[in-house]
């Protein structure tokens, strides 16, 4: 009995040692050499693994940066921003051009007041599920479905649902422009746009492509595709296609002429300073009557 146990232990020990040697030889022969700079780049990244860079995660993005070096034009981490990319460039010993910061914008103004409900949805609270089942619980089949898929997708707590309007609201201070909410929205009402000068932006807060009368019936704030905004824009920043106006933020100079011209209020201007009306000048005091000459007594 004792001899059997000893032989069993010896055989297993030898077998384990042989297999370990074989595994070591195979690992050394087929190992893939990895650039040590990948680890260095990964250390300076935020570590959010949000996928906003277009890669699977921060590790994959670090590898992509190393492989793309010295040209980092296609590499950008929205969470780290320009400051983070400067750190990446410093590790790789290259230069990188600064990019315009962006923010998520909700292009729908179909509030509970503007877009009345025509039916009530009682299924699973998910925008994707709701969109797959039917066109929504209002007359507009293009607008926000209100289930908060974008809120759930945001890792930074930058989006919340407004209980009064029923629409998502973006916190610009927290938004990193990772694009997770854009991918999560089945109606494509969320868009990444340049923050603009002093965070001021002008955009069409509507995605309805129905004809004007149909769109207006479904929502009081819908774009009706009249084209008035495009006609008054001096910079050719506005186009109208499929009954819907769109403002190219790379051409827009923030003159706001389109905002004043829009008959439905579908164009929004945000973060502009409030211009206080000039106080009216006080009416001038009436002129004093001219003095009468004094007659001398004779």
Q: What kind of feature is each model-predicted range?
A:
Residues 2-226, 231-232, 261, 265-268, ...:
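Ferredoxin-type iron-sulfur electron-transfer modules and their immediate structural context
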Residues 228, 238-240, 244-246:
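Strongly charged, low-complexity linkers/loops
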Residues 164-166, 236, 243:
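Beta-strand-connecting loop/turn residues
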